[in-house]
């Protein structure tokens, strides 16, 4: 919140709020037209996966040529199109990777950056009429609880989209719902070869 809220104010958003109950930062780009437009929301998460994420050292690869990317020569860490064929889709583009020692955290810093950049572009383009556009940046997506406390009614959008990675131009319009379960089975720890009628 300490970084996002001032940045949202700097680009001219209003109603910037931090909800201490659910950890979400929300804001609104006010409508610039008297026409009737739906209120659209864009959502991204602030948390990253629970792995090494301190002291991130991004590597920038300009004009990627389709070759192996050596992230850490000493530890023999690399990204290769042999293992990651999708790299070939980005030949000629600039790639940003980790140095192989930590997470990059692009999931979902990239989504936040996309939303803020899009809002800047929309705000700067006087010829794009729009209704209210709302944003929400929240925690706990990586542990599957990000939406548990999200105030959908309070967000007040007709439609909302989550920005969370994927190839340029791809739109996912449905997804699965995942949950975690802990199953405890009480019984005898017996080798499967002799377990018939005795294990449970």
Located regions from the model:
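Acidic/His- and Gly-rich active-site-bordering loop/insert found
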Residues: 1-94
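Conserved active-site and cofactor/substrate-binding residues in soluble primary-metabolism enzymes
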Residues: 3, 20, 37, 110-113, ...
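Broad gene-expression machinery/nucleic-acid interaction feature
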Residues: 24, 39-41, 132, 158-160, ...
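Short beta-strand segments
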Residues: 41-45, 136-138, 161-164, 184-186
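Short glycine-enriched loops at secondary-structure junctions
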Residues: 46-48, 83-84, 166-168, 176-179
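Acidic/histidine-rich catalytic neighborhood of metal-dependent amide-processing enzymes
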Residues: 88-176
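Acidic-enriched catalytic cores of C-N bond-cleaving enzymes acting on peptides and small amides
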Residues: 173, 195-200
